[in-house]
Amino acid sequence: MSAELPSIPAWEPVPGLYILATPIGNLGDITLRALAVLRSAALVACEDTRVTGKLLKHYGIKARLQRLDDHAPPEVRARVIDEARQGPVVLVSDAGTPLVSDPGYRLVREARAAGVTVTSIPGACAAVSALAIAGLPSDRFLFAGFLPVKDKARGEMLEGLAGVAATLVFYETAPRLVKSLHAIAGLWPEREVAVARELTKLHEECRTGTAAGLAAHYAAHPPRGEIVLLVGPPAEAEAPVQDTDTLLRAALAEAGPGKAAGLVAKATGIDRAVLYARALELKGA
């Protein structure tokens, strides 16, 4: 005898701002509490009204939608906060938990300053889901959002995190994944890395290995979908990171990418193929 699915609980609408997580892929991951709050919402503030509109339609929910992203002017946030004084206003992102590399920080800060109650309606989060299945140390982790697009900025950000004794968690796009893996391999060739993609969807995958090995795999098999990139913490005996970009630039001033990669490989012990790929990126920058 199969158990009946629980019904959506009754909820007495209470004024305030509700930060509500939505599914990151599998629509079955919405919570009963989230559905109850959405059904009673006076207003749903969202990144994209089309995306949220489709989501609500799937659950049979009708709601008034207000586009609100990081570019929204102060007067739009002020109107949303005024509504939250009168009834329940929900903030959602396109997928996952709002404010985790998504808009909403300014709205929450201003709502709290205005004395509006802010409540979390928890649910899916890609960063936490990836950490849970990657097999990397999870007792301490640092979520750092998206890696910068520019090579120099990306390298500087990674170097700044070199001494963090925790698993590093990033969001990344499919087109930039291989470049980011090359950058990580140049700094931390021995660290364990995980690439989690299409989380909760049909083709969910979590692949682990060195950054160089993963870069080679995804160069041959270009990925699709949303990606979470995780880097394990440094080993206790890990030597200070050398600035390989500086070494490569100096070598490139005197030689071509192949020879420059060979020279730096001898000096650092980093895989020549990884350095060669990075040398080509620097030469084309």
Region roles according to the model:
Residues R106-V164:
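Class I SAM-dependent methyltransferase SAM-binding "motif I" and its flanking Rossmann-like core
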Residues D70-E83, P103:
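Short phosphate-binding loop-to-helix
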Residues S2, P6, V14, P88, ...:
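A contiguous loop/helix-start segment that scaffolds small-molecule binding in enzyme catalytic cores
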Residues L38-V44, G115-T119, T167-L168:
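Short active-site oxyanion
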Residues C46, S93, V118-G123, F170, ...:
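General beta-strand structural signal in soluble alpha/beta enzymes
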